[in-house]
Amino acid sequence: MTNVEVDKKTYEMPPKEGFTVAHFLTVADMERSARYYEKVFDGRILSMGDTEGAPVYIQIANTWLLLNVGGGPTPDKPTVILSVPPDPNRLSSFMNIRVADIQACYKLWKSRGAEFITEPIDKYGEARCYIRDPDGYIIEVGQSDPGVKYG
């Protein structure tokens, strides 16, 4: 496996109709994090952001990741300050990537520099493992057992 394939639909940003879900991460270094997600997950960088506050926009498979340095408060978030996780072992949320072949993704992404906390482990009807990114965020990678249905 040399690439993770996704259907041929487009996921536009900004969307021309309806909406698109994106995930925002506060990072210490936008360039470093952008290159990490580009290299490990074959992300397509649309914009590298700037020092005026514009975030990095990266398309990863069928979703968008926005990266920006911390700060605040701002007029639209008057009581909120954004920062990277102070303790990478105490997090309140994480990204979850569902894959068709976890072993292939594990080998490919590890060869591209992903730091896995463990190898894939079978648990609750799926195999899963976690990656830690350069800012300490974790990313779950999971493959459901055959026959598992959602909904």
Where are these regions (language model features)?
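Vicinal oxygen chelate
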Residues: 2-22, 44-97, 104-132, 144-151
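Short phosphate-engaging motifs
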Residues: 32-33, 101, 105
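Conserved active-site tyrosine of GNAT-family acetyltransferases
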Residues: 33-38, 109, 136
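Short glycine-/small-residue motifs
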Residues: 140-141
